[in-house]
From Swiss-Prot:
Coiled coil: none annotated. The gene is acs. It comes from Yersinia pseudotuberculosis serotype O:1b (strain IP 31758). This is Acetyl-coenzyme A synthetase. CoA binds at residues 191-194, 311, 335, 523, 584. Its cofactor is Mg(2+). Keywords: Acetylation, ATP-binding, Ligase, Magnesium, Metal-binding, Nucleotide-binding. It is an enzyme of class 6 (ligase).
Length: 652
C-alpha cells in the first residue's frame, strides 16, 4: 500500500478537547476492568425518572443470550431530547433544515420542536396508538420525520422507520413483520430535483392482503401532489394537528422497553428487525456523540445520513438532541444542483462538525477541485466518516480538500446492531492513520479470532468479535430471538461476531478489511477486498472499484474487479494492463486482478453500500437467482452489468 503516516493531534484541538490521551487510557481501563462502576457513572449523562440501581446484567452464553442495562431505571427519551433543555436553551436552534432546493431552509428551536412533538404525540393517541404499538414511518428528510419519531418515543410507541427510497414490496414486508398499527408518510419526497412517490408506494404496499393491522395513514404535505386518497383511512397531518393540544406529559418507560425496530439486510435476503431499547441505547448514543465529535455547546453539527438508517437515528437525531446540540438535517444529495453543494452547505450554515460516508467522498473526489469551487469551509473543526471502510486515498482527499488539512477525521466503525460507535478515533486523544478506525470506544472489547475462534494476539488479522456487552447493543431481532443468537453468537461461542474482518497493527490500531464474506483466498493467502479496492482507487484515473472472488481451478479464487473511471477517462487495452500492474506494484503479485470489468455504475443500496452479493453472482455467471434486489437504489444497473459481462473481451 502507499505509505501511511500518522497525523498528530492538532494543537488547536488538543487545547479544548474533552478527552485527552491520558483521559482515554484512564477511562478505557476503568470501563473494561469495572464496567459497573464506569457505566454507573456515565449513565448520568441522561435524566432518569427512577434512577437505576442495577447497571449491567448480560450474557453471551449459547442458548442464554440476554442483554440488559440499567434495567430497574425508568426514563423517557423525548423528555431527554427536548424537555430537559427548555429552561436553558429553549430558544436555541435544535434542527437546521436545508432543503433539496438551495433556496429552502429553516430552523426549529428546542421550544418549537417540543411543542410540535407534544402536539403530534396527542394526534397519535387520538388515532388509537398506545404504549408498545409499532408505528411505521416512511418519510422524506423533513423536520416532521423527527417530530414523528420523537412523538412515538414520548408516548411509548415503538417506531419502525423505513428509508424513503425503499420499494412498495420492501415497505409491505416491514409492515407485516413488525405488525405496525399506523403508517406515517408524505405525499412525495424530493431528492436531487426529482419527486419520490412516497404516498403512492404506501398505497401499493397496503394492497398486500397480508397487511391487516393498518387502520390509518397519516400524510404530511411536502409537495401538494397526492394522487390516490382513501377516505376513512388517509388523513392529512395538517388537519390532525389543528385540533391537537400541545400538552402531552412524557410516558414513564422502563430502560428495557423497546424504543425502535430498524430493519437491516440479512445474508438470506429476509430483512432482520433489529430491536433497540430505551435506556442503554440513549446513554450510549449521547456519550459517543459527545466524545467522538468532541461536541462543545454552540457547535453546528451536520450528519448527512437519512433518518431511515441507524446513523440517522443515533447521530442525526437522538445523540445530538440528548446533548442539546444544533443538528443539521439535509433533504438533498451532496452533488446537487452542483458538485460543490456539500461545501456550499458547510459555508452557508457555518458547519463545525461534518459526518458523511465514503461513497459521497469518493463521488466528490472524482470531480476534483470542482467539489470545493467557490467555498472556504473554514468553519469546519472535526470531520467523520461512516458506512464502510474508507480507503486511504479518499481519506487524504477529504482531509486535505474538504477539511483544509486541519480537521481530525473520526473514521467510525459500528453497525445497526451496535447502536453506536465501537471503534473510532477521539479527536483530542488519537493520532490518526488514513483508513484506520484506530481504537475501541470506552467499554468496547474487540478481539481478533481465527476461523476456529482462537484469539490472535498482537499484530494480527482475523474475524472481528466483541467479547463483552455495551449499553447500545441491540437486544434481539423482532419476533426471532433464535435468529439473533444464530446470526451473532453461534459462530464464535460467547462472543458477538460482527461479520467483519480486521487487522491490528503494531500500534494496536484496527483496520477493517471488509465483510468476512468479502475476504478472498488466493493461492492460500487471505486478501481483504477493501485493501485491493484501496489500491485500485489510488490510481489517478479510477473513481470507484469493487472487488469479488470468482472460482479458479488453480488458485482457488481469482480476483474480479469492477472499475468506474473518472469523468472523461475511457477504457483502453493499455489502461487494462496499466491498472493490473499498478495493483501488482501497490500490494504484490498475489493481489493482481485477473479480470477488469469497466462499468459506469455499481449496484448500491440506498445507503450507498455496494451490494457485493450481486457482483459475485454476475462475475461467476450465476444469474439464475440474484436474490432480493429491492434495496438497490437503481435496479436497472444489474441488467447493464449483465450486458457488459456478455460483451466483455479480456485483453490477453
Amino acid at each position: 500500500m502507499s505509505q501511511i503516516h500518522k497525523h498528530p493531534i492538532p494543537a488547536a484541538i488538543a487545547e479544548h478537547a474533552l478527552i485527552t490521551p491520558e483521559k482515554y487510557q484512564h477511562y478505557y481501563q476503568q470501563s473494561v476492568q469495572n464496567p459497573d462502576e464506569f457505566w454507573g457513572e456515565q449513565g448520568k449523562i441522561i435524566d432518569w425518572i427512577k434512577p437505576y440501581k442495577t447497571v449491567k446484567n448480560t450474557s453471551f452464553d449459547p442458548g442464554h443470550v440476554s442483554i440488559r442495562w440499567f434495567e430497574d431505571g425508568t426514563l423517557n427519551l423525548a423528555a431527554n431530547c427536548l424537555d430537559r433543555h427548555l429552561a436553558e436553551r429553549g430558544d436555541q436552534t435544535a434542527i437546521i433544515w436545508e432543503g433539496d432546493d438551495p433556496n429552502q431552509s429553516k430552523t426549529v428551536t428546542y421550544k418549537q420542536l417540543h411543542h410540535d412533538v407534544c402536539q403530534f404525540a396527542n394526534v397519535l393517541k387520538s388515532l388509537g396508538i398506545k404504549k408498545g404499538d409499532v408505528v411505521a414511518i416512511y418519510m422524506p428528510m423533513v423536520p416532521e420525520a423527527a417530530v414523528a419519531m420523537l412523538a412515538c418515543a414520548r408516548i411509548g410507541a415503538v417506531h419502525s422507520v423505513i428509508f424513503g427510497g425503499f420499494s412498495p414490496d420492501a415497505v409491505a414486508g416491514r409492515i407485516i413483520d413488525s405488525h405496525s398499527k399506523l403508517v406515517i408518510t408524505a405525499d412525495e419526497g424530493i431528492r436531487a430535483g426529482r419527486a419520490i412517490p412516497l404516498k403512492k408506494n404506501v398505497d401499493e404496499a397496503l394492497k398486500n392482503p397480508a397487511i391487516t393491522s393498518i387502520k390509518n395513514v397519516v400524510v404530511f404535505q411536502r409537495t401538494g401532489n397526492a394522487s390516490y386518497w382513501e377516505d376513512g383511512r388517509d388523513v392529512w397531518w395538517h388537519d390532525l394537528i389543528k385540533e391537537a393540544s400541545a400538552d402531552c406529559p412524557p410516558e414513564e418507560m422502563n430502560a428495557e422497553d423497546p424504543l425502535f425496530i430498524l430493519y437491516t439486510s440479512g445474508s438470506t435476503g429476509k430483512p432482520k428487525g433489529v430491536v433497540h431499547t430505551t435506556g442503554g441505547y440513549l446513554v450510549y448514543a449521547a456519550l459517543t456523540f459527545k466524545y467522538v465529535f468532541d461536541y462543545h455547546p454552540g457547535d453546528i453539527y451536520w450528519c448527512t445520513a437519512d433518518v431511515g438508517w441507524v446513523t440517522g437515528h443515533s447521530y442525526l437525531l437522538y445523540g445530538p438532541l440528548a446533548c442539546g446540540a444544533i443538528t443539521l438535517m439535509f433533504e438533498g444529495v451532496p452533488n446537487y444542483p452542483g458538485v460543490n453543494r456539500l461545501s456550499q452547505v458547510v459555508d452557508k450554515h457555518k458547519v463545525n462538525i461534518l459526518y458523511t460516508a465514503p461513497t459521497a467522498i469518493r463521488a466528490l473526489m472524482a470531480e476534483g477541485d470542482k467539489a470545493i469551487e467557490g467555498t472556504k469551509r473554514d468553519s469546519l473543526r472535526i470531520m467523520g466518516s461512516v458506512g464502510e471502510p474508507i480507503n486511504p486515498e479518499a481519506w487524504e482527499w477529504y482531509y486535505n480538500k474538504i477539511g483544509n488539512s486541519k480537521c481530525p477525521i473520526v473514521d467510525t466503525w459500528w453497525q445497526t446492531e451496535t447502536g453506536g460507535f465501537m471503534i473510532t478515533p477521539l479527536p483530542g486523544a488519537t493520532e490518526l492513520k488514513a483508513g484506520s478506525a484506530t481504537r475501541p470506544f470506552f467499554g468496547v472489547q474487540p478481539a481478533l479470532v481465527d476461523n476456529l475462534g482462537n484469539p490472535q494476539e498482537g499484530v494480527a488479522e482475523g474475524n472481528l468479535v466483541i467479547t463483552d456487552s455495551w449499553p447500545g447493543q441491540a437486544r434481539t431481532l423482532f419476533g426471532d430471538h433464535d435468529r439473533f443468537e444464530q446470526t451473532y453468537f453461534s459462530t464464535f461461542k460467547g462472543m458477538y461476531f460482527s461479520g467483519d474482518g480486521a487487522r491490528r497493527d503494531e500500534d494496536g490500531y484496527y483496520w477493517i478489511t471488509g465483510r468476512v464474506d468479502d475476504v478472498l483466498n488466493v493461492s492460500g493467502h487471505r486478501l481483504g477486498t477493501a485493501e485491493i479496492e484501496s489500491a485500485l482507487v489510488a490510481h489517478p484515473k479510477i473513481a470507484e472499484a469493487a472487488v469479488v472472488g470468482v472460482p479458479h481451478n488453480i488458485k482457488g479464487q481469482a480476483i474480479y474487479a469492477y472499475i468506474t473511471l473518472n469523468h472523461g477517462e475511457e477504457p483502453t487495452p493499455e489502461l487494462y494492463t496499466e491498472v493490473r500492474n499498478w495493483v501488482r506494484k501497490e500490494i504484490g503479485p498475489l493481489a493482481t486482478p485477473d479480470i477488469l470489468h469497466w462499468t459506469d455504475s455499481l449496484p448500491k443500496t440506498r445507503s450507498g453500500k455496494i451490494m457485493r452479493r450481486i457482483l459475485r453472482k454476475i462475475a461467476t455467471g450465476d444469474t439464475s437467482n440474484l436474490g432480493d434486489t429491492s434495496t438497490l437504489a437503481d435496479p436497472s444497473v444489474v441488467e447493464k452489468l449483465l450486458e457488459e459481462k456478455q460483451s466483455m473481451q479480456t485483453p490477453s
